[in-house]
Amino acid sequence: MIRHLLLVLFLLVSVLPSTARERSLSEIRQAACSVLQGQSNRVQVQEDALQIALQKEMLTVVTHHGCFAVIANDDAFDAVVGYAEGAFSMENSSLVWFLNTVNESMADDIKKGNGHRTSIVPDASKFKSSIAPLLTTTWNQKEPYYNFCPVADNSTPYPTGCLATALSQIMKYHSYPTHGIGEKQYSFRPSEGVGEILYANFGETTYEWSKMLNDYKKDQYSDEEANAVATIMLHCGVAVEMNYTPTGSGAYSSEALYGLIHFFGYNQNIGLVHREYYSLEQWMNLVYTELNAARPIYYAGYDASQGGHAFVIDGYNATGLVHVNWGWGPNGGNGYYDITLLNPRGYQFSEGQNMLLGIDLPTTEVEYESHIVSDYPLSVSQIGKMLSVSVGETIWNLNGNAWEGELAVVLEGEGQTYLLSKGTVSKTAYQYNVLSKTNPAIGGVLTLPTGIADGEYRLYVGAKCSLDKRWQLVRRSEEQVNSYQVTIADGAVKDVVADTDDTWESTTTAIKAVITKGTNAPSRYFDLQGREVNGSTKGLIIRRQGDEVKKVLVK
């Protein structure tokens, strides 16, 4: 029942002073009053009726009649960090992880004197202004969801695990598959008590999606309905070899990726992406792109004290707050939160954040992208007419599974793609160094291709396997140099400029193949992904006429 919030939230995101200032308790209450009033049509929210549920250094949780708001204590940040219907509870470990991580990251931002930070609003030229929550389920980890999970010494089943709950809700959204693929067993060894073999026959099981309720209220469901949801919960646990414990069960995102594809038959091109190798803008673009394709996102975070946390992002509002289904039931804090605060500039709280993109049916077209990264910046310098390229000491495979393909030093521009240096990568395990499997080695002092046209180019290290349609940027840690802009004049290098931007995309996918000699050649137009479009297409497009390539802004 979250309504009428857009105007309220836009008013809250007003122009703030250039210097950070702590909000007074009255200002915090006023901000909370405004946002909570937008959530409740039952009663008029009175400021003096608000309750302070939690106060931390950088944020305050304010509650009122079964709703709560998270307000930033310092006006260096937008007032509203999050808001939700449902009672606030510190038992929700994923929500607690979010609050603790945001609190620490905001404090570090203030300590470093960073300026005013705002959430990243979806670009109206690319995305819908808002998307209502995609999930209708409000499942949790207890009864009846855990009915088929292994039993602890006290005869109570272990919790399903936040990962299994997240995956199960996403699969319920798709109501797929009817039957799984194959079977699996693994040895479960609890920290206390006797271990056991856990088994699931995915291929012989019929998943009764129509019998799974959006919410299971005590004494309001049948055994058949309970068994339907308990089955998918257990099977998700077996698929990822869940480590069940009485206080919370866990597994890895890479295992979730493998299980979705190999045991449940989901799209082969699901991608695992890691926050620390994306700029904040590009990370949010990934989120908005996925949700505009009507695909809920599996999202995971990690902290040293409590381990991993998995939940579902399934919508967003006009101010850039995403809707989170925490997997803690209808009163588990599901609502809108500012995930951009999880990673302050230059401070790696993002290490441990990842998400799965492209969770969809196998018949849906999802473009595959290799995820190969480095913790070292790219280094390029000019040596006369040549380029000296250092690709970094290590380059890691973070695809979530084994990878083989090619690495190359790519020079791209003027409608052409040149490979200045290329090596073949033999099969490399997940989280292993692909450079050690690359032959020949790439980089060093490199010469320009003969006859290269003068103009502006981008040089980067690219990765490509048999599934990629284009060279994929080997991503560097956020704010590290990942490419260079290279100016070519008279067939020689004139200038090289380092670039940390990662929002650009290859423009030569289709353009390269349509070169026509002669100045009277007809014009052809392409979008920034290299797909041919009509010349009247609005936005930034690329025009090729003969050998001439220009970017054109059509209004």
Task: Write out the residue ranges for each language-model feature.
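Active-site-adjacent structural segments surrounding the nucleophilic cysteine of cysteine proteases
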Residues: 77-249
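C-terminal outer-membrane/trafficking sorting elements
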Residues: 16, 508-555
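Active-site-adjacent substructure of cysteine-protease-like catalytic cores
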Residues: 43-65, 258, 262-325, 333
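Short beta-strand elements
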Residues: 467-507
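Residue-level detector of functionally pivotal "anchor" positions at catalytic/ligand-binding pockets or at interdomain
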Residues: 350-373, 505-529
